[in-house]
């Protein structure tokens, strides 16, 4: 039979975000009904990853391609998911596991970012982009490589779309944080600031970005502060996931480890090189969902190869 595909999501206390992730999984099931397609979450939702693996095995899979449903490679993709794969290999020694790569700055992702920004501009009315500033907001991580990718995306969109200025900030963990970035943007004097949340799906953090942007705009009526939509379910996103799934199924993800803090001595992160690969989400696996704040765990994680095709993500 075809190799099974196991989509791994972060999980959220916000049921809307979980539902959007599950929608993508259902689209893949409908697209390829002859393939076993399951999912698992790192935290705050069920099924957890181990349960998703078990479902694949129960349905007859002898090869499982594990696909991280994430934009950037930080602690979750580099440690937590490979740690789960280690456990799955121990539990199912006769099953082969492949590990795919995160979406990263796939051309479809960049194009979808552009479309979401343009949708917001059209809704707000015409304005010269030379008089506008683009602010890309990432999740924020203790991994500088992931944070740098957000800054790279901001530059690509800034130059490619012709904004007067562009910048990157984050909603947590690292700096600059969104409130500080909004203040800086305001001081620069641009007539319009377009805030783009670089998130796959909605959730506590995406809604926080929107709320903070709207509140800042109300306090500063002299400038226009717009919050664009996040990526969300879209044919471009589906096709990007499909490409990553094919790579994973064939055990041939093309990974770039040149700036991974677990392999290379980066300034300020020297102690991370060669740390053991250990998951950090055991205490929040599948604990349920509510509308409260999302207690996110983004510690410094160790990283070694998971072995075989499920190695460094």
Where are these regions (language model features)?
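Active-site-proximal alpha-helix that buttresses catalytic centers in soluble enzyme cores
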Residues: 1-313
């Amino acid at each position: 039979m075809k190799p099974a595909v196991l989509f791994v999501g972060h999980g959220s206390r916000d049921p809307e975000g979980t539902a959007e992730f599950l929608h993508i999984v259902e689209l893949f099931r409908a697209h390829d009904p002859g393939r076993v397609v399951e999912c698992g979450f790192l935290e705050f939702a069920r099924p957890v990853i181990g349960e998703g693996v078990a479902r694949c095995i129960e349905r007859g899979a002898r090869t499982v391609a594990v696909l991280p449903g994430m934009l950037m490679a930080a602690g979750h993709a580099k440690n937590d998911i490979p740690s789960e794969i280690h456990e799955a290999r121990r539990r199912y020694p006769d099953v082969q596991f492949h590990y795919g790569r995160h979406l990263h700055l796939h051309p479809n992702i960049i194009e979808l970012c552009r479309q979401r920004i343009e949708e917001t501009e059209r809704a707000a009315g015409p304005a010269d982009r030379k008089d506008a500033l683009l602010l890309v907001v990432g999740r924020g991580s203790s991994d500088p490589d992931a944070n740098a990718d957000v800054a790279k995306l901001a530059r690509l969109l800034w130059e490619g779309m012709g904004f007067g200025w562009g910048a990157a900030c984050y909603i947590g963990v690292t700096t600059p944080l969104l409130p500080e970035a909004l203040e800086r943007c305001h001081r620069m004097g641009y007539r319009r600031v377009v805030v783009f949340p670089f998130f796959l799906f909605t959730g506590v953090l995406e809604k926080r970005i929107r709320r903070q942007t709207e509140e800042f705009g109300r306090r500063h009526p002299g400038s226009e502060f717009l919050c664009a939509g996040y990526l969300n379910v879209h044919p471009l996103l589906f096709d990007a996931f499909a490409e990553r799934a094919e790579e994973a199924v064939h055990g041939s993800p093309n990974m770039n480890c040149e700036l991974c803090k677990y392999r290379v001595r980066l300034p300020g992160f020297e102690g991370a090189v060669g740390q053991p690969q250990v998951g950090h989400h055991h205490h929040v696996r599948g604990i349920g969902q509510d509308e409260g704040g999302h207690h996110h765990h983004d510690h410094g994680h160790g990283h070694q190869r998971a072995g075989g095709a499920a190695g460094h993500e």
